[in-house]
A protein has these predicted regions:
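PP2C/PPM-type serine/threonine phosphatase catalytic domain
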Residues: 1-388
């Protein structure tokens, strides 16, 4: 499949269909892996109660046609339990989001994310008519001065350093609104019992969508964590303690999933752990003509022919998106900036050497999903026995 400036909308539809089908394939109930060539770990677990894993977590890496560095997008979607087609809604959210990021990658990161998130909202709304939906949390790294994050729903983004843990995202729940606007100093769990943890907005909602944007700098010596509510239910304090006592991203991700199971495993639990500084150093290593997508269970590679998008194709896409997107315009945004400078390192090697290095990294970084099987995977008696 070739994607580029002279491509038709059909090529992006094919890209979307392939990513969606791959994300929605049947998998075992739990897996954890370190993403080859990137200092990222992703993990998911069905838990001990749910019959279906409606979480999706994945990483996208490709070289935008108009830019000199690769773009890495880490995203997590949590299909809404109890609503129609939660698992498919999450798959549709991520596949649409990734496709639109590739399509609009020539724009600024925030403009690109805005278009991609609104398109994902339209896609889920079209299928489920407001009766199904998903959260969406994403982190984008492209070598810019700041790292851009975005979220809709109650999946979270945390910044982690030796100094502690900071929530960078904003929860779209009744509990969070009550705490924000009533200035009452209670823990989130107390708010949930008083006001409920219902989402006030999500991907697939039939109303104005407010996307929460955050700009951060690289947490020196730290990491960024994306988590579904089934994972961060263990509490910020425990998330921080586990980080302080974990030697790498894979071990940290595994321990979060395991502790969520020890807490009862009442919901699906998924995380992505990102060593930002390590990724920033590798953005000069080109993905070439390949779009890479990873989830906790495997890797997908798609051919991409990078060219500058033509105004003609952009106008076609804009007119097609315009009707529904106007209804779901973004209102506002939030910006947070930490005071830590990021470091970048230039690379000066030819294409063949780069390819060899990437192959070597692929061989060195093995999937640890089978070696580090989670607590719930070892002890749960639910599900298809053939999956174990």
């Amino acid at each position: 499949m070739l994607l580029g400036g002279s491509v038709s909308c059909d090529s992006y539809e094919i890209l979307h269909e392939q990513i969606h089908g791959w994300l929605h394939r049947k998998n075992i109930s739990a897996s954890i892996r370190r993403v080859s060539t990137l200092p990222v770990a992703i993990a998911t677990d069905i838990g001990l109660v749910r019959k279906e894993n409606q979480d999706r977590v994945a990483v996208l890496k490709f070289r935008p046609a108009s830019k000199s560095k690769d773009m890495v997008v880490v995203a997590l979607a949590d299909g809404m339990g109890g609503m129609e087609g939660g698992g498919n809604a999450a798959s549709l959210t991520l596949s649409t989001f990734f496709t639109e990021v590739v399509r609009h990658s020539y724009l600024s990161v925030r403009e690109c994310l805005e278009k991609a998130i609104l398109k994902a909202n339209d896609a889920v709304l079209k299928i489920y008519k407001g009766n199904g939906g998903s959260t969406l949390t994403a982190v984008v790294l492209d070598g810019s001065e700041y790292i851009t994050t975005a979220n809709v729903g109650d999946s979270r983004i945390y910044g982690l350093t030796n100094d502690g843990i900071v929530q960078l995202s904003e929860d779209d729940t009744l509990a969070a609104l009550a705490k924000k606007y009533n200035n009452i100093d209670f823990e989130a769990s107390e708010f949930d019992s008083r006001f409920g943890g219902e989402l006030v907005q999500f991907i697939g909602i039939d109303s104005v969508l407010q996307i929460h944007f955050f700009d951060i700098t690289a947490p020196q010596g730290g990491a960024v964590l994306l988590s579904s509510d089934g994972a961060h239910t263990i509490g910020d304090n425990n998330l921080n303690k586990l980080f302080m006592h974990s030697s790498n991203t894979g071990l940290y991700a595994k321990r979060i999933i395991d502790l969520a199971s020890w807490f009862g495993g009442f919901d699906n639990a998924s995380v992505a752990v990102v060593e930002v500084e390590g990724i920033l150093k590798d953005l000069d290593v080109s993905s070439g003509y390949v779009i890479n997508v990873w989830d906790p269970f495997g890797e997908l590679k798609l051919v991409n022919l990078p060219q500058t998008l033509s105004n003609h194709n952009e106008n076609q896409a804009s007119s097609a998106d315009g009707k529904q997107s106007e209804k779901n315009k973004v209102q506002g945004g939030v910006v947070k900036k930490t005071a830590v400078k990021k470091k970048t390192r230039s690379r000066n090697s030819n294409a063949k050497n780069i390819e060899k290095k990437e192959l070597n990294k692929n061989e060195e970084l093995e999937n640890i999903s089978q070696l580090d099987m989670s607590f719930s995977e070892r002890n749960s008696v639910k599900g298809d026995k053939n999956e174990r």
